[in-house]
Every structure is written in C-alpha cells, then in structure tokens.
Amino acid sequence: MTDNNATEDSGLQESFLSHLFELRDRVIKAALAIIIVFVCLVYWAPDIFHLFAQPLLSALPAGGKMIVTDVTGSFFVPMKVTMLVAFIIALPVVMYQLWAFIAPGLYLHERKLILPLVVSSYTLFIIGMAFAYFLVFPTVFKFMASYNAPLGAEMSTDIDNYLSFAMTTFLAFGITFEVPVVVVVLVRMGMVPLAKLREIRPYVIVGAFVISAIVTPPDVLSQLLLAVPMTLLYELGLLVARLYVPKPSEDEAASPAD
C-alpha cells in the first residue's frame, strides 16, 4: 500500500515537473519570437515612433512639437514603442505557444473552438487598436487642441506621457473589441445562458459608461468613443452567440415528455 502511494506521488511529481519544463520552453520560444522581431525593427525605431505619434503631431498647430523632459526619454520611448509593435507582430506565435501548451488537456470539441477564438481574438484586438489610432486619437486631440487657442495656451506634450496615454488607450480599445468573443465563450461553454445575457443588457450599458469614465480622459467625447462601441460590440456578441448555443443532451430533451 505504501509502495503504491509512493509510486503514485512520484508519478504526480514527474508529471508536474514535465509540465513545468514544457511551460518554460514555451515561454522562452514566445520571448525569442518577440526579441527577434524587435531586433529586426530596432533600426527603424525613430520612424516607428514618429508614425506612432502622428495623430498628436497632426493636431498640433504649425511648428508645434513634442517635448522630452527626461534625459533618456528620447532613446527609451522609441524603444518601448518598437517593443510594443514587436509584441503585436509576434502575438500569433505567442498564442500558438499557449495553445500548444494547453491543447493536450482539452476535449476535442474544445480544441475545435480554440482556433477560431484565437484568430478572432487577435483580429478584433488589432481592429480595436486601429480604431483608437485612426479615429479616437485624431478626434480627441483635435477636440483638446481647439480649447487651447482661446486660452492662448500652447499644447506641448511630453513623449513619455504620450506613450503612457497611447498604450492605455490601445489596451482599453483592444480589450473592448474582445467583448463579442467573451460573450460567445460564455454562451458556448454553458456558463451563462443567452437569455440571461440579454436580460442584463441595461446593466452592461451602464457598466460600459462606467468603465469608459475610468480608463479614458475626463471628457465626454472620449467616454462616448469607448462606451458606444463597447455596447454595440456586446449586441454583436449576442447575435453571434445565437449560432453557438449548446444543444441540449438527449436526456434533457426527453425530460419534458416524461
């Protein structure tokens, strides 16, 4: 009896260590993918940052410039932006490593669901960032700049502050555009019935405005630009989730007849 328990404990320990080593290897491969892309892009770091800052630069008055208040800011900020771009480009590899690690523990029907979820999640995240870059940034910056002229103030933004603002906004809109995926997963896995998600629609709308008030600048325009898409994407998720409502088992289907 003791020998059997010892053998079982030894097997569990070996299994845990093998999973731990595999996780380490997957993390290393994902990190290497990001580093390789970063090294390939680092030469163009100033150009990447200029493109990154273009929405703000275009809103500045003629001759307006961004400023640097930190001695190392002009070097590290473009590097951070380039690292962000490298992460986005390498994200499919990162997702694949995550998928390869968890796939052996999933059922067949769960594996079939993972691939479309990963592809749609990545696509929607990129669309969310593009929405922020091409629509939200120009709209907000021009709106803010219009208030400076009557005050006789000149808008000169520090590049480090701009980086923090832009990354927070990118993350907020990227996650916001994941709402349809979250809704579909909740319905498909049977965690929340579709009818319940429809029932809590008013609370979701209120929550969207609360979240937008927290993560966006304190102006109504920015909050609307986040809250309205979040609400519409929730509705889109409800529509798509209708296709993924789990079918009742034979026993559940036959129970009313009993």
What is the role of each PLM region?
Residues M1-D258:
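Membrane topogenic/interface segments and analogous intrinsically disordered interaction regions
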